[in-house]
Structures are given as C-alpha cells and as structure tokens.
Amino acid sequence: MDETAKARGAQQFEEYWARQMADPAFAAVYAEEAAKKELWLQLVEARQAAGLTQAEVAERLGVSQAQVSRIEKRGYDAYTLNTLRRYVQALGDDFRLEVNVIQQARPLPV
C-alpha cells in the first residue's frame, strides 16, 4: 500500500470516527468503556509498581487470589468504593477519588 492510500484510509477513518462520536449514545458508551479500561490499567500498574503479586494483595485483603484477579479483570465494573479503597490501601497507597465533569449537568426528569 502506497503512502497516498494510507493517508486516504487514515482520513476516511477519522471522518468515520468523528461521525460515530457525534452520536451521543455511542460517545457515552465509548466514554464508559474507556473509563473502565483506565481504572483496570491503574489497578494493575499500581500493584506491579508496589512489587506485589495478586496472591500477596489477596493475603493483605483477607480474600482469595481469585477475588483479586476478578478485581483486576479488564472490563470488570462491579467495584464498590470500599473495595477500591481497601485494594489501594493493601498496596500501601492512599485512595483518592477524582471526578471530572465533562458536560454541564442537566436536571434530572421529575
């Protein structure tokens, strides 16, 4: 494939992606999936940076290694704040929740 064809393909993809992201429903699903991936990566990378295995974290939490594996599973989204707090503290870190409001809040229907 020559460079012109590659550039044309890249431009077509960018146009396609812009159309997809213009759809609020698609953009919402994409944002949710991206947030899950980001959380998953942060948990795994934090454990690895702490030099701990899943088994060691499990021991500190008083749960099975399988439960830690489930927490670290990509796409898992049944976290509670307490689970996240305990997990991060088991790594020897402080838990901090940051909320970024991307769109203006809308009133909820009554």
What are the language-model segments listed below?
Residues 81-98:
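DNA major-groove recognition helix of helix-turn-helix/homeodomain DNA-binding modules
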Residues 1-38, 102-110:
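N-terminal flexible/basic segments that precede or flank functional cores
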Residues 49, 60, 90:
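Residues within the alpha-helical elements of helix-turn-helix
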Residues 41-56:
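Short basic helix-loop element that most often maps to the first helix and adjoining turn
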Residues 54, 65-66, 95:
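The DNA-contacting recognition helix of HTH DNA-binding domains
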Residues 71, 100-102:
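Short loop/turn motifs enriched for small/polar and acidic residues
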Residues 61-77:
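Recognition helix of helix-turn-helix/homeodomain-like DNA-binding domains
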Residues 36, 77-80:
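Short, conserved glycine- and acidic-residue-centered signature motifs
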